Amino acid sequence: MFLIGLFLRRQRRRLMLDVGWSSAGHFVSPGASHVPEESPAEVRRKMEWLRGQDPDFSVILLEDFITALYVEAHTARGSNALEKYSPYLRPAARSTLGSLPRVPVSTVIVGALRLVHFATDGRTQQSRLVVELESNSTEEPPGAAPVSHYALERWTFVRSFGARSRSPDRVRSFACPNCGAPLERTTHGRCTYCSQAVDSGQFDWVVEKIDLLARETRGPMLTGTTEEEGTELPTVLDPGLSAARIEMARRDPSFNEQAFFGRVQWIFATMQHAWTSLEWQRARPCLTDRLWRAQSYWIEAYRQQGLRNVTENARILRIELVRIAADRWYEAATVRVHATGLDYTVRTVDGVVVGGHRAKERAYTEYWTLVRSAARHGPTRAQPACPQCGATLTMEMAERCGHCGTLVEASTFDWVLSRIEQDEVYTG
């Protein structure tokens, strides 16, 4: 689950993944097969099996890889360059993308990525992962005005049991998955440099098929009011939380839950201001790069519909730590955030409220997962600081320290928000 507006709690339930879009331009791929759906949390739990085969496996990095490949693939289909990505897109997947208009594609933004299903097949010795991606892209037909398209697609990935995961520095780069040669050296899924067929999933995740579930020029429904669900549900605590707390203290004796909660409070307040002021750059130090970029999808969706989502007097009432986890690259901590505030949507042309209430606060709870680099230990800061010189970073220094010039990759120096899940669907 990802943010919509600031906290996604209301608008998300009216989007295509949950209810349906407007009918303009909508279609369902006739060849779309039924997939048994699981909750994202259940998929993540099942994927822990991969760590026994592949110690470098990280769900966080896999989601980054999928997002990057999605952007590359749609950009390539607009320039008739899908063959270049044959190591990562099987013929059926390329054929589906190739059926879309072959016009230049720009500003591809993934607004949501949902893990749908995971299974292993001992007969083929492969893992299979199904994800759904919701996106916005701009097509630029020659001699015509640019057109924005909203889409929902289901991508099916496969990978051999013996394959190994990428390191963080390689997660967004695409080359021969066997020898690292440029993709220009591959033809029909075979690298001409190492003479190896590389599109079988033997070396990396490969897209076996793509189902185009919806595509339209009108975006998701962003008006109306939806009541909260799940706020009164009991908190879902991970059964291994006590042991995970002990292990966290062993890895990082300086970790302090109250300081961590202070970081959550700062992220909450910063996001609220950045969203309502339409200065989303201010939230960059708070979020993973993928999550930060995804929000421009929703900003653009509101803008194109002549709407503005407003949050006022938003405040956290209580925070509960519910889960701690770690892989080779990242540590993750999930909290349940109990909050309240005003949340409404107005038409920009006249200020008329078309969703929510301008004067009625609503209480809600969400599960937030924060991550930081596994290599970063030390006191948690409520404010961002440069990892090189320690200077406090202003919002204008979100990408580069204004004191020493060091590039700032948010999760390398402290906890940042990676995922938001609604209380009625969170299962641990």
Predicted feature locations:
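Alpha-helical transmembrane anchor segments and their immediate juxtamembrane flanks
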Residues: 1-17
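Core segments of small alpha/beta cavity-forming domains
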Residues: 27-106, 193, 197, 212, ...
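Surface-exposed, charged secondary-structure patches
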Residues: 101-147, 303-350
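Intrinsically disordered, low-complexity segments
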Residues: 121-123, 133-162, 166-167, 203-243, ...
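Short metal-coordination and nucleic-acid-contact micro-motifs, chiefly zinc-binding Cys/His arrays
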Residues: 169-173, 187, 379-382, 396-397
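Short cysteine-rich clusters marking metal-coordination/redox-active sites
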Residues: 176-179, 191-194, 386-389, 401-404
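Long C-terminal interaction/binding lobes of large macromolecular proteins
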Residues: 185, 261, 280-282, 289-293, ...
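Short, non-ligating residues that shape and space the ligands of small metal-coordination modules
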Residues: 185-186, 200-203, 395-396, 410-411
